[in-house]
Structure formats: structure tokens, C-alpha cells
């Protein structure tokens, strides 16, 4: 397994080159493209090795305002033209995907993990309902602070939405990282 990305762009994007399908992972606020104990680098390598896909891990600096459309436009100059995007968002990255993912027609699937439910809930609900891709999966650890609002997800009017609660998992899936990695691989395969 590689111990580094193929490319690092301004400490914001870690890139593993592959085929025309792109897995775009947006970390939580303050997250780096490597993640704690290289969890994102390892995930990127595993996905690339298993499926041959291109993978970009996008850091979410604490002091930044992110625009998903702008980010997907920026990366075009660093990676070969991609035909399809599977978006994986963690925490604030999940919120970004829920609220803005529908704006990009190349995003065909979204996996949103522990996104803060009550930060601009109407915008989150509207974004999921407008999403025209194949599938949206929202995963919440039952020990995550947002889990107490989990039932409100049933108000989202979308046949493409699947919601999953993971017993024992906290916001960072500490001690359960393998379960989260398994869910991510399952999401990519389906």
C-alpha cells in the first residue's frame, strides 16, 4: 500500500489517480487530507486498489467556507476528466454534500456520515429532495450528537434516501473505524 498520495495540492487535496470514476471525500471541519492515523490516505489507497477509481480527499480547513461546485471545478486541472462522482462527506463534509450535492449532475451517489442535522435543516432537506442521482445514504452513529434528531430524516421526501443508524458509534467512529470503512466500500460497490 502506498504511504503517500500521487499528488498533494496546497495541503488541501490528496489525490490518488485512477479511472474515470471519481470518489470525492470531503472531511469534517478541521480535517486534513490524511486524517487521524492516515485513515483517509489508507481509505483512498484501498478504494483505488480494489476498484481502480480515482480518489480525492478534500481537507476542510477550520477557517474556510466551502463550495462544492467550486471544488469540483478546481480539481479538473489536477485529475483526468471524470465521468461520474461518488461523494462521501464526513461531519461538516456531509452537510456540504446534503446541501449542495444536487447542484452537480456528475454526482450520482452520496454517502453522508454524521452530518449535523440541525444546522440549516430546511436547506439540508431541500438538497436531498432535489438530488437527481441514484442514491443518498445517511449514516449516523447512535452516540453522535445529531442522532437525537435522527427521526426527522423520515420527513425527507426522497425514494433515493437510505438512512442507517450504527449502534455504539460516536461522531468519529472511534474504535469502529473498520465498520465505517466497510460501509464506505459497500456504498461504492452497490
Segment roles from a protein language model:
Residues 6-57:
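Short, surface-exposed "cap/lid" segments of acyl-processing enzymes
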Residues 60, 111-120, 141-143:
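Active-site nucleophile loop of the alpha/beta-hydrolase fold
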Residues 88-97:
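Gly/Ala-rich beta-loop-alpha elbow adjacent to hydrolase catalytic centers
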Residues 131-132, 138-140:
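Short beta-strand/loop motif that positions the catalytic acidic residue
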Residues 145-151:
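Conserved alpha/beta-hydrolase "acid-adjacent" motif
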Residues 169-178:
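Catalytic histidine-centered segment of alpha/beta-hydrolase-like enzymes
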Amino acid at each position: 500500500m502506498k504511504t503517500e498520495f500521487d499528488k498533494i495540492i496546497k495541503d488541501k487535496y490528496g489525490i490518488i489517480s485512477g479511472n474515470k470514476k471519481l470518489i470525492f471525500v470531503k472531511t469534517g471541519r478541521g480535517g486534513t487530507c490524511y486524517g487521524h492515523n492516515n485513515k483517509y490516505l489508507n481509505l483512498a489507497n484501498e478504494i483505488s486498489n480494489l476498484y481502480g477509481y480515482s480518489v480525492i480527499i478534500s481537507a476542510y480547513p477550520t477557517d474556510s467556507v466551502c463550495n462544492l461546485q467550486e471544488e469540483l471545478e478546481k480539481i479538473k486541472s489536477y485529475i483526468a476528466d471524470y465521468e461520474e462522482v461518488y461523494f462521501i462527506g464526513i461531519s461538516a463534509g456531509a452537510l456540504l454534500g446534503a446541501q449542495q450535492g444536487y447542484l452537480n449532475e456528475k454526482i450520482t451517489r452520496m454517502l453522508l456520515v454524521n452530518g449535523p442535522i440541525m444546522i440549516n435543516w430546511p436547506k439540508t432537506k431541500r438538497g436531498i429532495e432535489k438530488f437527481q442521482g441514484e442514491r443518498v445514504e445517511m449514516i449516523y452513529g447512535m452516540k453522535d450528537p445529531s442522532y437525537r434528531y435522527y427521526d426527522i430524516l423520515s420527513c425527507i421526501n426522497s425514494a433515493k434516501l437510505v438512512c442507517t443508524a450504527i449502534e455504539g458509534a460516536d461522531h468519529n467512529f472511534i474504535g469502529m473505524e473498520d465498520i465505517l470503512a466497510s460501509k464506505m466500500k459497500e456504498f461504492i460497490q452497490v
